[in-house]
Curated annotation (Swiss-Prot):
Organism: Homo sapiens (Human)
Keywords, sorted A to Z: Chromosomal rearrangement, Coiled coil, GTPase activation, Phosphoprotein, SH3 domain
Phosphoserine sites (modified residues): S817, S820, S821, S837, S858, S954
Domain notes for this protein: The F-BAR domain mediates oligomerization, binds membranes, and induces plasma membrane protrusions.
Disulfide bridges in this chain: none
Record protein name field: SLIT-ROBO Rho GTPase-activating protein 3
């Protein structure tokens, strides 16, 4: 019964143990499930974050593009607007500046959001992807380690189970042995008790041995059981000890796993997860914070610009920007009628009483008006202050609308209901408009009153001065002298040329061969015109011109004329460009032959630009040389034009689109749509790499396109040559000495009066300013420099410093006298003059035309023609500047590239100044007496002021006098011949006619040389010119302005008109109004003047 109970207890213990082990196994499995679930939740989180940032990056990119489009929309809108021009001219108004900064901030935000998109896509999302990979990898590693730990833990529990069963078994055996031992002891005790009672009384003597053997058996059995018990007890003790030790170890292992190992296992799963995620989020925060910082920086710039909004500064900027519009005009001058010389208010006795009464009435009226106007001004100031208070109310703070709290909606609604409500807005607008209306009413009243006060005050002051009511201001300073009239510029038509081959719709090669023009006239002239006026024309060659004007220009070219040679005849740039395209489009044989079409198109397959350029060069080198010369000229021009693509919007590709169909015709059988893109690419390549494709001038002679062209038609005569001088052009390559650029001296002058220039070409200066003079642009103008700026300086507003006082005073008096009385000479002399500009025939009034006959060098410069076989002297100073250095006044402000250079030679302003200074003027002796006296004065002059101008200091006065005498004789003869032929009366000069007539007796006939071509007329034979007899490169001395003798002691009147800048005359090889004819010069001779002697001439 006891064993059965014991057996049940063993089963219960084992069942309880097994239940406990099963529970542990279940826990271990659930642990892995929990860790796996945690890992999956992290992966899902990371995946959601990646998707979120990917979508946010797309939104940021879309937002960036939207901002860029928004900014570009308005930027392109204002790029060609007036505000953009203001910005370029550094006249930026403060509101426009704020607008530009807002656009700039928009672009900045666009770039920042694009950067944010890049950070999200290439940084944050990549980091999250890496963290996801780390989570999966760490969970797998942790799971492997966890499984190993679970196996170890289960192994320990299995060992404990085994030891426990062993312990139970040995303990059961020990208990069994113990019970047997106790039973044996009881039998032994019972046996001893029986044997003790019977031994004395009952047992017989013969029964004692039998009882002794029974006792021995019991003792032996007891000993045996005792031994068995001891053995089982020892085994049970050992088993119990093992069981207890294993039990402690198992409990310790389970405790360690649950307390430490599970935590460490979770740490392994979390290894670096939070740190990596934190770095990722910090990257996101850094990007957002930097975006916010960038935004704040941009907003700070805008805020600074808003703080600098200044109406007064903008007002000054607008007035400075449009100074020609807002500057005060010239004062109205008294215009005497029919010789009336009284120019002041007369206060003689018949009108003195009336003037005095009028004076007192004005005085009373002015006092009343001033009081009334002062009250109006005070009211105006108060109204302005009220209006400013209304306009400067601080209603711009909307921070309440961005309060993120539960009461946000109530705050927003409260804000909207108070200030920005429709009722309040309407009320404030009504008050503002009412105040503005009152302000403008008072302003109008104030302006009208102040205008009236100004007019009455002027009358009052003049009457006060006339009536002698106050101290009369002493006239301590003189007024500026009258400036000369603007010389008239007259177009001289180009000589007609007749060719046997058509210019348009013909063969270009045949025309070039027939005409001798290396570049057809229409190509050269159109390109020159566009170079001067159209490089910045937006959409040139793409925007069509007027068809009527295109046809007109075309017809002129077909007649052999050049309609673009005269800059005064303004032509539409797009029409000129259309004529150029029309010429190439109408050629019988396209510029690129159809036979080479496939070869040129095949070059597009070459990806390497160098190989493509080389292949195109090999194809074009097979074309005729005349065609290559034209191609080289045209594509050099197109490349130059493309350099202004920022302004004209015509880059090489756009030009190729315009010129592709014109220059390359698609052969029959080819698909125009597919071929056109290839044609455009070929033309674009040639435009970009034209220097590498076409041969250089050394390899192929012919005209070369120059980026800097002169402003007029380039003929091969000197600026001072007369019509017909081209007949005597010497084509030999002589080496005559001529005035060099380095042999010219600069002249300093001091401003005698203030002068404000009316155009960019005229310099503005103050009285007493130091001026640097280059050369004489005309009778009345100098080319000079002031404050580092080159321009025109009026002669009568300055005092030349480095001249001899007596000579300059005498010469200036004569020049001033002639400038004032030139047109008022006797009618008989005037009737002999033509109705033409004084600048039309320079040689009519001086010997510059005769001495200006030149021989042309290969570089296009003018070399003075030798007058005698053995004369090697330099020409007199009357010789004009060479073709290389035309007058500076030729520059036209309509194009920044229209600079006065010929043949493309780019020189510094100093060299051009020094080159032109040597030709300060030409001398005109009206008769032989003046000639002889002038000759004697010039030959006896011993001044060495300009002794440093050259190294040729051994000239003999006799040889120079002989040269001058021959020149004077020729000039006088031609002058008389021209006067005999001219029969039309000269047009009167409106300005000079208003001056007082010259009181001296009429002198010889002479027109006023108001020309920038350096001609100075000397009518008085006593007024001679100084020159150095020791220099072969002497120049005209300059003049000091002096008042005419007839005006001595009299108060000078203000100038009747403001100074006018000289206009450069277009030089021409022939004159329609001249009596001296010359044969027509072909364009080839104009382009290559030394083609017969030197073939290296360039355009």
């Amino acid at each position: 019964m006891s064993s059965q109970t014991k057996f049940k207890k063993d089963k219960e213990i084992i069942a309880e143990y097994e239940a406990q082990i099963k529970e542990i196994r279940t826990q271990l499995v659930e642990q892995f499930k929990c860790l796996e679930q945690q890992s999956e939740s992290r992966l899902q989180l990371l995946q959601d974050l990646q998707e979120f940032f990917r979508r946010k990056a797309e939104i940021e990119l879309e937002y960036s593009r939207s901002l860029e489009k928004l900014a570009e929309r308005f930027s392109s809108k204002i790029r060609s607007s007036r505000e953009h021009q203001f910005k370029k001219d550094q006249y930026l108004l403060s509101p426009v500046n704020c607008w530009y900064l807002v656009l700039h901030q928009t672009r900045r935000e666009s770039r920042d959001h694009a950067t944010l998109n890049d950070i999200f896509m290439n940084n944050v999302i990549v980091r999250l992807s890496q963290i996801s990979e780390d989570v999966i990898r760490l969970f797998k590693k942790s799971k492997e380690i966890g499984l190993q730990m679970h196996e170890e833990l289960l192994k320990v529990t299995n060992e404990l189970y085994t030891v426990m069963k062993t312990y139970h078994m040995y303990h059961a055996e020990s208990i069994s042995a113990e019970s047997k031992l106790k039973e044996a002891e009881k039998q032994e005790e019972k046996q001893f008790n029986k044997s003790g009672d019977l031994s004395m009384n009952l047992l017989r003597h013969e029964d004692r041995p039998q009882r002794r053997s029974s006792v021995k058996k019991i003792e032996k059995m007891k000993e045996k059981r005792q031994a068995k018990y001891s053995e089982n007890k020892l085994k049970c003790t050992k088993a119990r000890n093992d069981y207890l030790l294993n039990l402690a170890a198992t409990n310790a292992a389970i405790s360690k796993y649950y307390i430490h190992d599970v935590s460490d296992l979770i740490d392994c799963c979390d290894l670096g997860f939070h740190a990596s995620l934190a770095r990722t989020f910090r990257t996101y925060l850094s990007a957002e914070y930097n975006l916010e910082t960038s935004r704040h920086e941009g907003l700070d710039v805008i805020e600074n610009a808003v703080d600098n909004l200044d109406s007064r500064s903008d007002k000054h900027t607008v007035m400075d920007m449009c100074n020609q519009v807002f500057c005060p005009p010239l004062k109205f001058e008294f215009q005497p009628h029919m010789g009336d010389e009284v120019c002041q208010v007369s206060a003689q006795q018949p009108v003195q009483t009336e003037l005095l009464m009028r004076y007192h009435q004005l005085q009373s009226r002015l006092a009343t008006l001033k009081i009334e106007n002062e009250e109006v001004r005070k009211t105006l100031d108060a109204t302005m202050q009220t209006l400013q208070d209304m306009l400067t109310v601080e209603d711009f703070d909307v921070s309440d609308a961005f309060q993120h709290s539960r009461s946000t909606e109530s705050v927003k609604s409260a804000a909207s209901e108070t200030y920005m409500s429709k009722i309040n807005i309407a009320k404030r607008r009504a008050n503002q408009q009412e105040t503005e209306m009152f302000y403008f009413t008072k302003f109008k009243e104030y302006v009208n009153g102040s205008n009236l006060i100004t007019k009455l005050q002027a009358k009052h002051d003049l009457l006060k001065q006339t009536l002698g009511e106050g101290e009369r201001a002493e006239c301590g300073t003189t007024r500026p002298p009258c400036l000369p009239p603007k010389p008239q510029k007259m177009r001289r038509p180009r000589p007609l040329s007749v060719y046997s081959h058509k210019l348009f719709n013909g063969s270009m090669e045949a025309f070039i061969k027939d005409s001798g023009q290396a570049i057809p006239l229409v190509v050269e002239s159109c390109i020159r015109y566009i170079n001067l006026y159209g490089l910045q024309q937006q959409g040139i060659f793409r925007v069509p011109g007027s068809q009527v004007e295109v046809n007109d220009i075309k017809n002129s070219f077909e007649r052999g004329e050049d309609p673009l040679v005269d800059d005064q005849n303004e032509r539409d740039i797009n029409s000129v460009a259309g004529v150029l395209k029309l010429y190439f489009r109408g050629l019988e044989n396209p510029l690129f032959p159809k036979e080479r079409f496939q070869d040129l198109i095949s070059t597009i397959k070459l990806e390497n630009p160098a190989e493509r350029v080389h292949q195109i060069q090999q194809i074009l080198v097979t074309l005729p040389r005349v065609v290559i010369v034209v191609m080289r000229y045209l594509f050099a021009f197109l490349n130059h034009l493309s350099q202004y693509s920022d302004e004209n919007m015509m880059d090489p590709y756009n030009l190729a689109i315009c010129f592709g169909p014109t220059l390359m015709h698609i052969p029959d059988g080819q698909d125009p749509v597919s071929c056109q893109a290839h044609i455009n690419e070929v033309i674009k390549t040639i435009i970009i790499h034209h220097e590498a494709i076409f041969p250089s001038p050394r390899e192929l002679e012919g005209p070369v396109y120059e980026k800097c062209m002169a402003g007029g038609e380039e003929y091969c005569d000197s600026p001072h040559s007369e019509p017909g001088a081209i007949d005597e052009v010497d084509h030999d390559n002589g080496t005559e000495p001529h005035t060099s650029d380095e042999e010219v001296e600069q002249i300093e002058a001091i401003a005698k009066f203030d002068y404000m220039g009316r155009s960019p070409r005229e310099l503005s200066f103050k009285k007493g300013a130091s001026l640097l003079l280059y050369h004489r642009a005309s009778e009345d103008w100098w080319e000079g420099r002031h404050n580092g700026v080159d321009g025109l300086i009026p002669h009568q507003y300055i005092v030349v410093q480095d001249m001899d006082d007596a000579f300059s005073d005498s010469l200036s008096q004569k020049a001033d006298s002639e400038a004032s009385s030139g047109p008022l000479l006797d009618d008989k002399a005037s009737s002999k003059n033509d109705l033409q500009s004084p600048t039309e025939h320079i040689s009519d009034y001086g010997f510059g035309g005769v001495m200006g006959r030149v021989r042309l060098r290969s570089d296009g410069a003018a070399i003075p023609r030798r007058r005698s076989g053995g004369d090697t002297h330099s020409p007199p100073r009357g010789l004009g500047p060479s073709i290389d250095t035309p007058p500076r006044a030729a520059a036209c402000p309509s194009s920044p590239h229209k600079i006065p250079l010929t043949r493309g030679r780019i020189e510094s302003p100093e060299k051009r100044r020094m080159a032109t200074f040597g030709s300060a003027g030409s001398i005109n002796y009206p008769d032989k007496k003046a000639l002889s006296e002038g000759h004697s004065m010039r030959s006896t002059c011993g001044s060495t002021r300009h002794s440093s101008l050259g190294d040729h200091k051994s000239l003999e006065a006799e040889a120079l006098a002989e040269d001058i005498e021959k020149t004077m004789s020729t000039a006088l003869h031609e002058l008389r011949e021209l006067e005999r032929q001219n029969t039309v009366k000269q047009a009167p000069d409106v300005v000079l006619d208003t001056l007082e007539p010259l009181k001296n007796p009429p002198g010889p006939v002479s027109s006023e040389p108001a020309s920038p071509l350096h001609t100075i007329v000397i009518r008085d034979p006593d007024a001679a010119m100084r020159r150095s007899s020791s220099s072969s490169t002497e120049m005209m001395t300059t003049f000091k302005p002096a008042l005419s003798a007839r005006l001595a002691g009299a108060q000078l009147r203000p100038p009747p008109m403001r100074p006018v800048r000289p206009v450069v005359q277009h030089r021409s090889s022939s004159s329609s109004s001249s009596g001296v004819g010359s044969p027509a010069v072909t364009p080839t001779e104009k382009m290559f003047p030394n083609s017969s002697a030197d073939k290296s001439g360039t355009m």
